[in-house]
Amino acid sequence: MGKAKKTRKFGLVKRTLNTKKDQRLKKNQENIKTKEDPELTRNIPQVSSALFFQYNQAIKPPYQVLIDTNFINFSIQKKVDIVRGMMDCLLAKCNPLITDCVMAELEKLGPKYRIALKLARDPRIKRLSCSHKGTYADDCLVHRVLQHKCYIVATNDAGLKQRIRKIPGIPLMSVGGHAYVIEKLPDVF
């Protein structure tokens, strides 16, 4: 008969409690309670009085449409007239608006986008002045929409669309196919 093989037994170390992280100890429970401050108030933004059951009553014809840089570029690619396309999409009169930041962004893009710049200088498109520093158009549009919820935002930028979707009651317009598409416009009118 052979000898029975004796293998070494691993992991026979006695377990000890970690007193710093063990939640069963009284002093650690007290530390957890002190971290939870009952006076901590949640920061809830003030909801506009124009919003009634998720419909923005401030948006009515003639619609004020804020235009982004890439919306103009996509309109040129798809050969859609901006003012006529907006009126066909919304079935009402609309006022296309462009901010100084969007114009500055178009000017920075250089001669490749000169047709878009020429289209943005169209007299039918009204120009809004900006009083803030910097020329980042996305931040400018989001800031303007947060101040006054009476605009429709026209953009094809996915990042800007995500930011605008977080703001309740603001419709989005984008270029889809060879026409404009609107999101979240109430059927009240």
From Swiss-Prot:
Q: What's any GO biological process attached to this entry? A: maturation of SSU-rRNA
In terms of one coarse class, where is the protein primarily found? nucleus
Q: Which SMART domains does the entry link to?
A: PINc (SM00670)
Gene Ontology CC terms, in alphabetical order: nucleolus; nucleoplasm; small-subunit processome
Q: Where in the cell is it found?
A: Nucleus, Nucleolus
- Give every PINc domain span: 63-162
* An MF annotation (GO) of this entry: RNA endonuclease activity
What does the sequence similarity comment in the record state about its family?
A: Belongs to the UTP23/FCF1 family. FCF1 subfamily.
This chain belongs to which protein, by name? rRNA-processing protein FCF1
- Gene name for this UniProt entry: FCF1
